[in-house]
């Protein structure tokens, strides 16, 4: 329940204003707990001082990675320890062993290899030296059997052409840092999904393919399952693991690796694929950028039930069941179909455009809250990717709420309540549209497509934050004023 900020302060003398500083605030009170400079103000030095990664709150201390080493502070600001492990970008902690792991980016030292350091509870380095890993580390998981590390070579997740990227999976001995596998399993592409399961690890490849390996690195499937490219969804269902890619969908038996449906649902490659579950009919509803399908969860029998065209060449971003009807939307488009795919309405409102949009931040509060959740999950020792149950509201929102409920403070209890609200079906869609007078904010009913509320501002470059959970609009009305509207 702390907010940690690093940068340069605007107050103080000239030397203080150009010296990097860290400040810690209490989220419950909004008051500053303490602050400190990373170097002595006014002191001439050739060393660069800066915070290099996210700070972590753990074991009644705040651990801060900097360009000159890792620093641990008490909540009152006392320095508990510091070491010389420089340029750590990511910190992970293990509650069971009271151990700290830090990842140093190879790019910061002109290397193609990232480096992993292990520290004890007092910041002392536990391994003789950091363990070098080929490529950029994209996934780091602490398990009871060892440390699983996925790294991406030749550009990794930031590469434009996914086919040029290839991942490696390593499994390290937590005691020594040595690789426990004589031979790493073949990936033949970029690892897009990576989950710990009961008997090993399950992973999906961006170029297509799903495989499961044991904790000793052996394949548990007879052969990797071939899938379409870009696996957008991997989730558990009563029938097995459902996967949805940019061009196909099926369910896998996780014990055998065989598909449950005799034939996969195949469709023309789509930039966006969204899905939901119709509990009443026992069908998955899958929507591509132009076509909607209904699939029987048990047999895999499917049929195309609707086709559509989004204005402004938008792609669907959300789908949900509204009773027996199907709601499909993007930023500026809203569709409602009955359960047979017959169109009930289509509403479209022209977007403000890039020049008019300014710094509008739709859903910024929800995004910030999700990022905070991910950080707290790592701090709590739950730094594992989550293979959730496929359900009507989605596993991620449910996990967000569960994570905060385990943190016993008023601020996080309030956050849990907000996430519970986000799990519940919302009845309206909020969008911005261009009007003759400026930019208008519309609140529309998902069930009817009708306008429920409207707000227009003459500001050509408005700054908004919309809290879609509690239905508030925060609007910067001038340089010193933030106005709040109930929407």
For the regions a language model picked out, list residue spans one by one:
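Secretory-pathway ectodomains
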Residues: 1-487
């Amino acid at each position: 329940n702390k907010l940690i900020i690093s940068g340069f302060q605007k107050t103080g003398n000239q030397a203080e204003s150009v010296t990097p500083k860290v400040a810690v605030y209490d989220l419950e009170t909004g008051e500053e707990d303490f602050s400190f400079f990373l170097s002595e103000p006014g002191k001439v030095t050739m060393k660069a001082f800066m915070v290099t990664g996210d700070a972590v709150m753990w074991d009644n201390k705040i651990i801060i990675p900097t360009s000159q080493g890792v620093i641990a502070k008490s909540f009152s600001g006392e320095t508990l320890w510091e070491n010389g492990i420089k340029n750590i970008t990511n910190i992970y902690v293990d509650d069971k062993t009271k151990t700290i792991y830090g990842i140093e980016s190879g790019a910061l030292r002109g290397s193609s290899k990232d480096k992993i350091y292990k520290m004890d509870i007092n910041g002392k380095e536990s391994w003789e030296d950091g363990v070098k890993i080929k490529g950029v580390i994209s996934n780091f998981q602490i398990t009871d059997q060892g440390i699983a590390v996925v790294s991406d070579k030749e550009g990794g997740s930031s590469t434009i052409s996914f086919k040029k990227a290839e991942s490696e999976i390593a499994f390290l001995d937590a005691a020594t840092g040595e690789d426990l596998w004589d031979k790493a399993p073949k990936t033949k592409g970029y690892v897009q999904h990576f989950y710990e399961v009961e008997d090993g690890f399950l992973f999906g490849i961006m170029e297509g393919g799903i495989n499961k390996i044991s904790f000793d690195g052996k394949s548990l499937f007879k052969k990797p399952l071939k899938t379409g490219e870009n696996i957008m969804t991997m989730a558990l269902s009563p029938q097995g693991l459902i996967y949805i890619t940019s061009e196909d969908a099926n369910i896998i038996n996780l014990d055998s690796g065989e598909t449950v449906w005799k034939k996969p649902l195949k469709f023309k490659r789509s930039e966006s694929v969204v899905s939901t579950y119709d509990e009443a009919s026992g069908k998955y509803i899958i929507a591509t950028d132009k076509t909607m399908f209904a699939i029987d969860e048990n047999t895999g029998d499917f049929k195309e039930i609707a086709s559509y065209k989004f204005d402004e060449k938008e792609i669907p971003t959300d789908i949900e069941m509204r009773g027996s009807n199907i709601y499909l939307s993007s930023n500026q488009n809203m569709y409602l179909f009955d359960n047979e795919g017959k169109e009930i309405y289509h509403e479209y409102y022209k977007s403000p455009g890039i020049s008019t949009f300014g710094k509008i931040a739709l859903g910024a509060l929800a995004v910030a809250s999700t990022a905070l959740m991910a950080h707290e999950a790592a701090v709590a020792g739950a730094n594992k990717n989550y293979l959730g149950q496929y359900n009507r509201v989605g596993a991620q929102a449910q996990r967000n709420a569960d994570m905060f409920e385990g943190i016993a403070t008023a601020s996080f209890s309030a956050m849990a309540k907000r996430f519970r609200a986000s799990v519940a079906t919302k009845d309206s869609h909020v969008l911005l549209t261009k009007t003759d007078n400026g930019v208008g904010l519309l609140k529309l009913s998902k069930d009817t497509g009708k306008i429920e509320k409207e707000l227009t501002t003459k500001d050509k470059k408005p700054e908004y934050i919309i809290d879609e959970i509690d239905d508030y609009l925060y609007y910067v009305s001038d340089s010193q004023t933030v106005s709040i509207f109930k929407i």
